[in-house]
Regions:
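Terminal beta-strand-rich extracellular "head" domains
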Residues: 46, 51-52, 57, 69-147, ...
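Short, surface-exposed loop/turn motifs at beta-strand boundaries within globular domains
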Residues: 2, 38, 58-60, 71-73
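Small-residue-enriched segments and motifs
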Residues: 4-7, 65, 98, 174
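Glycine-rich, low-complexity segments
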Residues: 3-51, 181
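Short, polar loop/linker segments at the starts of domains and inter-domain junctions
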Residues: 17-21, 52-65
């Protein structure tokens, strides 16, 4: 067996390099072949533990994942789906704020996505429960090959309401795709 050492492959003519029938080009790891737009890796997380939030300061919901990009110029597509129940007895508008944070190893939290969900209740005689979904996708450009933690937080805009994320063990999910550039 021979080993060929080259830095670039190019065609003598035309624009196609052909591997003969019955022959296979084998890569030794998942990053051997890279083309723009290709998914390099996928990391997924789910959470079914109910998180109750009744305050106006951000708190972690419990949904998070870690990904270590293979290339510093990769984009990371983060898809978040969090089911929650909004409980309020106030006859006014209440807002639930959700955000996605990125923490690169050795750095500080950076908010990379934000979503506000409104709820209006006309009857204040009793508490009402409203099922809602916080769903968003964020194409992030972290510019690193260090470990990244993505996590979600939520808060209320005012008191007299509660959020129950993953209420009744509903599955909340986060999926991160590293996309080659």
């Amino acid at each position: 067996m021979s080993t060929l050492f080259v830095n670039n492959l190019n065609t003598a003519s035309g624009s196609t390099i052909t591997v003969p029938t019955g022959k296979v080009v084998v890569g030794t790891d998942g990053g051997t072949f890279k083309s723009p737009g290709q998914i390099i890796q996928t990391v997924a997380a789910e959470d079914t533990t109910m998180f109750a939030q009744g305050g106006t300061s951000y708190s972690n919901t419990g949904l998070e994942l870690d990904i270590t990009p293979k290339y510093s110029n990769s984009k990371i597509l983060v898809c978040v789906r969090e089911y929650f129940t909004f409980r309020t007895a106030a006859n006014t508008e209440r807002q639930a704020d959700f955000r996605l944070l990125r923490l690169v190893s050795g750095g500080s939290d950076v908010q990379v996505a934000f979503q506000r969900i409104n709820q209006w209740t006309a009857d204040s005689s009793t508490a009402h429960y409203f099922g809602k979904m916080s769903a968003y996708d964020k194409l992030d450009s972290p510019a690193t090959t260090s470990a990244i933690n993505y996590r979600t937080q939520c808060k209320l805009n005012a008191s007299s309401a509660d959020l129950f994320v993953s209420h009744d063990s509903a599955i909340c999910t986060m999926v991160a795709f590293e996309i080659a550039q």
